[in-house]
UniProtKB/Swiss-Prot annotation:
E.C. no: 4.2.1.33
An individual GO BP term: L-leucine biosynthetic process
Organism superkingdom: Archaea
InterPro entries the record matches: Aconitase/3IPM_dehydase_swvl, AconitaseA/IPMdHydase_ssu_swvl, IPMI_Swivel, LeuD, LeuD_type2/HacB/DmdB
Family membership: Belongs to the LeuD family. LeuD type 2 subfamily.
Listed name of the protein: 3-isopropylmalate dehydratase small subunit
Top EC class of this enzyme: lyase
Length: 161
């Protein structure tokens, strides 16, 4: 599974309240949630992400409240993958279950810049920046990879039954 897109870059400790503020949790439509993704940090995020982007972030991306809507909103907004130095465990699994690839890369925010063109091999974790710089992140394998390839946990379970 290869993903390529330009980078939107964020720092450390991007919590789920930033990803999708609590006032929107009563809504279930992914497209509506997408319009409010990252709103407290970047009100223009939806416009920037809609063409398809890869988020690069620092430590503990997705920390805070456990809300599946965070991964759902990012994916619906146009986020193709997230590369971060570390992820909150629950967010990591919610992302996989929603079909949103998440790759861990040490020093991600030092190695990759805003606007860089990045190609990610989700299985191997290889990341190519601007066609030349090669980085090695942690790939995804086994059942989590199968879930991603099928588009998320619900699709995976439907195909398995």
């Amino acid at each position: 599974m290869i993903i390529e897109a330009k980078v939107l870059k964020f720092g450390d400790k991007i919590d789920t309240d930033i990803i999708i503020p609590a006032k929107y949790l009563k809504y279930t439509d992914p497209q509506y949630l997408a319009q409010h993704a990252m709103e407290p940090l970047d009100p223009e995020f939806y416009k920037k992400a809609s063409s398809g982007v890869i988020i690069v972030a620092g430590k503990v991306f997705g920390m805070g409240s456990s809300r599946e809507q965070a991964a759902m909103a990012l994916k619906a907004a146009g986020v193709k993958a997230i590369i971060a130095e570390s992820f909150a465990r629950i967010f990591f699994r919610n992302a996989i279950n929603n079909g949103l690839p998440v790759i861990t890369l040490q020093n991600a925010t030092k190695e990759i810049n805003q606007g860089d063109l990045v190609r990610v091999n989700v299985e191997t974790g290889e990341i190519v920046v601007n066609g030349s710089k090669v980085l090695k992140g942690k790939g995804i394998s086994g059942m989590p990879l199968e879930i991603l390839i099928t588009g998320g946990l619900i699709t995976y379970l439907k195909k398995a039954s």
